[in-house]
Amino acid sequence: AGAQNVLLPIYLDVQEQWPEASYDYAYSANVLHIMPDKLMAPFFAGVGKILKAGGLCCLYGPFKYKKKFTSESNANFDLWLKNNNPLSGIRDIEVVVSLAARNALSLVHDREMPANNQLLVFKKQTSCREVSKNS
């Protein structure tokens, strides 16, 4: 609130043109499980494009691990999501990490958060060598 070195949020639509700019940080909360799964690839392509080398992307929300839910409540939430929109649903972390890696983003932290959510932190690689070393 009132910080002079932090920009106001920039709202992006994965189906629209993204700005020709570069940023140090991107944050998305409770989005991947709401959007249709076919939009995850353009999401990561956009993030990979706008982040500076060494920049961070933080994703907050529920995820599955090896196709398994982390809790019964997440399994129920996934059913609810799919009843409202069959193209939505809690995403597999392995798919998320793979899509991120295709866009020079490496997972550096995976933290448990309240209410069966995770905070995933991806770092934009600084060179081709760093990408191949971490993939």
Regions found by a protein language model. Name each.
Residues T70-E94:
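Conserved Class I S-adenosyl-L-methionine
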Residues A1-P19:
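S-adenosyl-L-methionine
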Residues Y11, Y25-S28, D110:
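Polytopic transmembrane helical bundles with strong interfacial aromatic enrichment
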Residues W18, I34-M35, K66:
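Short glycine-rich, flexible loops that bind phosphorylated cofactors or substrates
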Residues A41-A53:
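A short glycine-rich, Lys/Arg-flanked "PGG" loop and its adjoining helix->strand segment in the class I
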Residues A104-S135:
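Core SAM-dependent methyltransferase catalytic element
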